[in-house]
Amino acid sequence: DLVGNTVKALNGQYRFQTMGEYRALLSLYNMTVEEARGNVRGREYHGLVYSVTDDKGNKVGNPFKSSLFGKSAGYEAVQKKFVRSKSEIKDRKLADMTKRTVLSVLQGTYDKDKFVSQLKEKGIDTVLRYTEEGRIYGATFIDHRTGCVLNGSRMGKELSANALQEHFTLPYAGQPPIPLSIPVDAADKAHGQTAYDSEDISGGMGLR
């Protein structure tokens, strides 16, 4: 079964520490997962239910109980996976490489689509979640180089959903960078006080 094989393969290859990070990983492969809780004959149980999704994340077809895919896809195994992933990521400092790459790309552009595509070229997929008003409320990075799924806020507040939302909606977001020959005060007038200091204007951030 394609869904089961994909779920098992992803569980073996990637590290994730929360259900949200697990869901972000699955979304790259048009799948999602939800927790199922209930009571059978007086005993409480926790389970996971997997679904196939369309490109907009809407569930299609019937859901699959995790028991169809074997123990590794079940609730208890995934909870253990969270704990194991946390210690591996911490002990081996696996988030550092991802953070460096994401920050370097972020500092190079205010264009969200360019940010996502440049990260993809470097081996990192970005999953952004939006409110109905179109604001970013969640950002997760899947680093295929290290096999880690990381919420932006886990790597620092400068990569949190709020910080990214602000970065991509600055007055000059989506605009070509200021020509480097413009003196600082002219640049300030052009944009209302920008957040640049003189070093940045002279090309310190290497914007393109």
Q: What do the PLM-derived regions correspond to, one by one?
A:
Residues 1-208:
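Extended intrinsically disordered terminal tails
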